[in-house]
From Swiss-Prot:
(6R)-10-formyltetrahydrofolate binds at residues 86-88, 114, 136-140. The lineage of its organism: Bacteria, Pseudomonadati, Pseudomonadota, Gammaproteobacteria, Enterobacterales. In the N-terminal section; belongs to the Fmt family. UDP-L-Ara4N formyltransferase subfamily. In the C-terminal section; belongs to the NAD(P)-dependent epimerase/dehydratase family. UDP-glucuronic acid decarboxylase subfamily. This is Bifunctional polymyxin resistance protein ArnA. Pfam families: Epimerase, Formyl_trans_C, Formyl_trans_N. The record marks 102 as: Transition state stabilizer. GO terms for molecular function: carboxy-lyase activity; UDP-4-amino-4-deoxy-L-arabinose formyltransferase activity; UDP-glucuronate dehydrogenase activity. Keywords: Antibiotic resistance, Lipid A biosynthesis, Lipid biosynthesis, Lipid metabolism, Lipopolysaccharide biosynthesis, Multifunctional enzyme, NAD, Oxidoreductase, Transferase.
């Protein structure tokens, strides 16, 4: 039975082994690259696939239309998901005639969502299990095919329960996979009235709140014990981790968080007391409780606290949806450079923000905005400033996938805008220079230029029109319901991390990244319709500084404003951009690793983008509003931007196979 598998972690490995043992023919396996900030104690699906001679892939977005098409070409009869961390789109699920099945680590419908292993321990459950269920569009909601119950012992911690669940999963799959193969299964619909759902946990969620009962704190310790990050507390500003604990029914009038004794190390709680059996001060070594007390300088009567003693004033909470994108990751870097921002981010990947994942003021959830609506609504309510940066913004997609562009760029963002209205939150919305369309003004002005687009049978305008309509909706909400907003319009921002070379390989990237790929691979640089179209290229650092000032909003000068962010002095045609890039490439110290330049080739836009494409001959911003509202002007010359962007991408290329 031809099978496509989505898998990660130990459960992914055992699921693959079970399929092979049951005689399934695995055509391809999709997995994830390991997160360098995560302690990898589990088996490698990629290594197992390689050892078994099975093609394995780890795309950033498996739901991209090109991956959907590649999976369709495999003609899977059935699909399995074993602890794959991304939701799989309905288009993929519908490819398999026998259906798609997911292995989930709880007794569904209880504990849908993320980290059920940890949540059942946090909540003090005495039973959990594994469930194999049919996959539907909504996460973990499909009919149940099989379940096995697993008892949770009082001394179970996360790793021991993980091993129990793996053992149960092997049994479950051994019993169930033959029945699926022969179409002989009985499915039971989940009872929605019994469903519970839990979100992703982060290390910051595991602080010990001493006013809670000792049993609750002990469960927290069990849930995140090694190899998870551990429960923690503070002595003054000194952080320490509790690796194991015991509950004492100690009757004491001491304030919660007070040290009752140091040998054993006993801490008063809201109800009872918690003995810290083993722990660790800062980044030190693990030690027994009494030695930990000595290391931390604790004596009877000392007080512990859940937060550092000298906590600064509350940071401004900024929600960035699409935080892993070009603007999102650079903006995150700028905000975290200051000491008064807390950044909350959501995206379907994390490669560009991996450098922030361990930052104490950066909180990331991997997910899709079309699915994580409850998480988004909660964080809109929780945060002070919202930046919905998620969009399909590459021209080839406007003609290739116009409906997907509309659904994501318009419909999903409209929902977020309405959350901002509902909870009265400030929104900073990314409009686009594309809204000006075929405007003939010498300088495109936010307040006076007409927004001119082509006919309906030219789908390339669906992005421009979607953004324009959202601009108008936001403006109306500001006028009629008091929404605090700023619209910003980027003009051809470029710099390191603008798309990636893999995106360029499938045509889904902006101009400079595509040109760099041509140089790297020794293929001709394609000049669409001769490359005479002119753009004003803006360095990402200039753009981000302007965006940062919008967030700062000195004197509330940005409220209700539309602000172009571009560099009118950096105007060049695409052909000129290609020539400047080539000159920089020829001088680069890594030049000898790459093939000879293959020349320029003029191609028609219809052959490259499709028949529904129209181009814009020029696009130059007026930056009058940026001067007035932000006291900002761009400073970085285009050549410097080209040099740094090229250098970044060349240093990401694996040079082992390149000629020298």
């Amino acid at each position: 039975m031809k099978t496509v598998v989505f898998a990660y972690h130990d459960m992914g490995c055992l699921g693959i082994e079970a399929l092979l043992a049951a005689g399934y023919e695995i055509s391809a396996i999709f997995t994830h690259t390991d997160n360098p900030g995560e302690k990898a104690f589990y088996g490698s699906v990629a290594r197992l696939a390689a050892e078994r001679g099975i093609p394995v892939y780890a795309p950033d977005n498996v739901n991209h239309p090109l991956w959907v098409e590649r999976i369709a070409q495999l003609s899977p009869e059935v699909i399995f998901s074993f602890y794959y961390r991304h939701l799989i789109c309905d288009e993929i699920l519908q490819l398999a005639p026998a259906g798609a099945f997911n292995l989930h680590g709880s007794l569904l419908p209880k504990y849908r969502g993320r980290a059920p292993l940890n949540w059942v321990l946090v909540n003090g459950e005495t039973e959990t299990g594994v469930t194999l269920h049919r996959m539907v569009k909504r996460a973990d909601a499909g009919a149940i095919v099989a379940q096995l119950r697993v008892a949770i012992a009082p001394d179970d911690i996360a790793i021991t329960l993980h091993h129990k669940l793996c053992h149960a999963a092997r049994q479950l799959l051994e019993q169930t996979l033959p029945a699926i193969k022969h179409g002989n299964i009985l499915e039971i619909a989940q009872r929605e009235n019994e469903a519970t759902c839990f979100g992703r946990r982060t290390p910051d969620d595991s602080f010990l709140e001493w006013h809670k009962p000792a049993s609750v704190l002990h469960n927290m310790v069990r849930a995140v014990a090694d190899p998870w990050p551990g429960a923690f507390s503070y002595v003054g500003n000194q952080k320490f981790t509790v690796w194991s604990s015991r509950v004492h029914p100690h009757a004491s009038k001491a304030q919660p968080g007070s040290v009752i004794s140091v040998a054993p190390l006993l801490i008063a709680c809201g109800d009872g007391a918690l003995e810290i059996v083993t722990g660790q001060a800062g980044d030190g070594i693990t030690m027994q409780g009494s030695q930990l007390a000595q290391t931390l300088g604790l004596v009877q009567g000392s007080r512990l606290n859940s937060q550092p003693a000298c906590t600064a004033r509350r940071r401004t909470r900024v929600l960035i949806l699409g935080v892993n994108g070009f603007i999102g990751n650079h903006l995150t870097e700028r905000l975290l450079r200051e000491d008064h921002y807390e950044v909350y981010g959501l995206d379907i990947g994390s490669d560009a923000i991996s450098r922030f994942l361990n930052h104490p003021h950066f909180h990331f959830v991997e997910g899709d905005i079309s699915i994580h609506s409850e998480w988004i609504e909660y964080h809109v309510k929780k945060c002070d400033v919202v930046l919905p940066l998620v969009a399909i913004a590459t021209p080839i997609e406007y003609t290739r996938n116009p409906l997907r562009v509309f659904e994501l760029d318009f419909e999903e963002n409209l929902r977020i805008i309405r959350y901002c209205v509902k909870y009265r939150k400030r929104i900073i919305f990314p409009s686009t220079s594309e809204v000006y369309g075929m405007c003939s003004d010498k300088y495109f002005d936010e307040d006076h230029s007409n927004l001119i687009v082509g006919p309906v049978n030219k789908p390339r305008w669906i992005y421009s029109v979607s953004k324009q309509l959202l601009d108008r909706v936001i403006w109306a909400y500001g006028e009629k319901e008091g929404l605090q907003f700023t619209l910003f319009r980027p003009f051809n921002w470029m710099g390191p991390r603008l798309d990636n070379l893999n995106a360029a390989r499938i045509g889904s990237s902006r101009a400079i990244t595509q040109l760099i790929l041509n140089l790297v691979e020794g293929s001709p640089i394609k000049l669409i319709d001769g490359g005479k179209q002119k753009r004003c290229f803006t360095d990402i650092r200039d753009g981000i500084e302007a965006l940062y000032r919008i967030i700062e909003n000195a004197g509330n000068r940005c409220d209700g404003e539309i602000i172009n962010i571009g560099n009118p002095e950096n105007e060049a045609s695409i052909e000129e951009l290609g020539e400047m890039l080539l000159a920089s490439f020829e001088k680069h110290p890594l030049r000898h690793h790459f093939p000879p330049f293959a020349g320029f080739r003029v191609v028609e836009s219809s052959s490259y983008y499709g028949k529904g494409y129209q181009d814009v001959e020029h696009r130059k911003p007026s930056i009058r509003n940026a001067h007035h509202c932000l006291d900002w002007e761009p400073k970085i010359d285009m050549q410097e931007t080209i040099d740094e962007t090229l250098d970044f991408f060349l240093r990401t290329v694996d040079l082992t196979d390149k000629p020298s």
